[in-house]
Amino acid sequence: MSQSDSQPFDLLLAGGTLIDGSNTPGRRADLGVRGDRIAAIGDLSDAAAHTRVDVSGLVVAPGFIDSHTHDDNYLLRRRDMTPKISQGVTTVVTGNCGISLAPLAHANPPAPLDLLDEGGSYRFERFADYLDALRATPAAVNAACMVGHSTLRAAVMPDLQRAATDEEIAAMRDLAEEAMASGAIGISTGAFYPPAARATTEEIIEVCRPLSAHGGIYATHMRDEGEHIVAALEETFRIGRELDVPVVISHHKVMGQPNFGRSRETLPLIEAAMARQDVSLDAYPYVAGSTMLKQDRVLLAGRTIITWCKPFPELSGRDLDEVAAERGKSKYDVVPELQPAGAIYFMMDEPDVQRILAFGPTMIGSDGLPHDERPHPRLWGTFPRVLGHYARDLGLFPLETAVWKMTGLTAARFGLAGRGQLQAGYFADLVVFDPATVADTATFEHPTERAAGIHSVYVNGAPVWQEQAFTGQHAGRVLARTAA
């Protein structure tokens, strides 16, 4: 045994079941940590440790990686990141749906960029400045950051309701190049949203050219997730092919009652594309989604709940149908007078949700909106809901598969080296949970309830969540992508 091997561990988790993030069966073993790394796995009963924790009867897993967040500003404003660490998340991927906090200096960013804003939040003219701020004031979790196409448009174009000119495309491409060179892991788009709805496929391809040279990811909230979802998928695949870069289909779903069941159509299309090019997807475990309040979404949804409303804050948490009735209007016609606002939309079918979650390559991403006054419960409950409700209670897949979908798979697809698995030499991002009791307790009525069954969470070897509370340690780092 070398001198380094004989040194006491800083942390020793003893007697737990290790589910290592590789989608293989769990095994009983001890895990030792030195500094920010996993130092040893096996029978460590005779080893010395500064801190030894008996985790008998509990699962030790890699910290969960939230593949789809809007935590860009929350990482700076609420550095404890309690909605995430309380459910075992140790890394968040930001800059999704075309929305990133940089590069943009803007006092009043257009919707949906305002989903990240708390007033004065858009102050970083370069992506490097944003990453520098994250490094200067680290959060409790790691962050892997993308740059958003809608943010680039807002930075360059005085009028977003048109296609970009060649000069504007070149300016956006320069900003994208700066972001990628500074450490962005990819570029996201959200052509579903007004700021980018007029962007052509060719514009997106040209703005995203820096991805090819930097080995970055192209992630997309597709142009349509309802009636025209097949055309949207084809556009997404084309962009990936022309740039020769990995594609991530964000929060895959089929929206609106007329489209219920169409995951039987979309998943084979995605699987076929995977055989030809690098395609990934993620999903959240709910039949309701949440974003800005939009008239077209209101028509698709069976029920709509207001999550925030700037002109009428008292409407947060109210049902849109009730508000419309009180004002003597249809729910469609009442939307303009409530702007800007956000909403939860019940518009998916449970069999589709289960089919997408059970699809082998599907990663787990919360898509939570942390600045909403009454957020969708996915912000607090996504990961324990997959582990408890879908894996344990419904038996949709084994616990080991559930863990893989939120750890090893995600780390591999996003190129997060040394993360997502329990291996000696890997970073000590860890979650300890009770497989019998882990569960989401956040509901649409009480959306900020903490998960049950999460014992403790470690980020880069430091404890960040113990005894149902933040420990005060801001151990997170800005993560780079290692291209495959």
Curated annotation (Swiss-Prot):
Molecular function in Gene Ontology: N-acyl-D-amino-acid deacylase activity
Keywords linked to the UniProt accession: Cytoplasm, Hydrolase, Zinc
Subcellular location field: Cytoplasm
Keyword check for Nucleotide-binding: no
Cofactor(s) of this protein: Zn(2+)
Annotated catalysed reactions: an N-acyl-D-amino acid + H2O = a D-alpha-amino acid + a carboxylate
GO CC entries: cytoplasm
Uppermost EC category: hydrolase
Enzyme Commission no: 3.5.1.81
InterPro entries with a match to the protein in the record: Amidohydro_3 (IPR013108), D-aminoacylase_insert_dom_sf (IPR023100), Metal-dep_hydrolase_composite (IPR011059), Metal_Hydrolase (IPR032466), Metallo-dep_Hydrolases_sf (IPR050378)
Pfam (any one): Amidohydro_3
UniProt keyword Ligase present: no
Predominant place of localization: cytoplasm
Transmembrane segments: none
Role played: Has a wide specificity; hydrolyzes N-acyl derivative of neutral D-amino acids.
Family: Belongs to the metallo-dependent hydrolases superfamily. N-acyl-D-amino-acid deacylase family.
Name of the protein described by the UniProt record: D-aminoacylase
Lineage, uppermost ranks: Bacteria, Pseudomonadati, Pseudomonadota, Betaproteobacteria, Burkholderiales
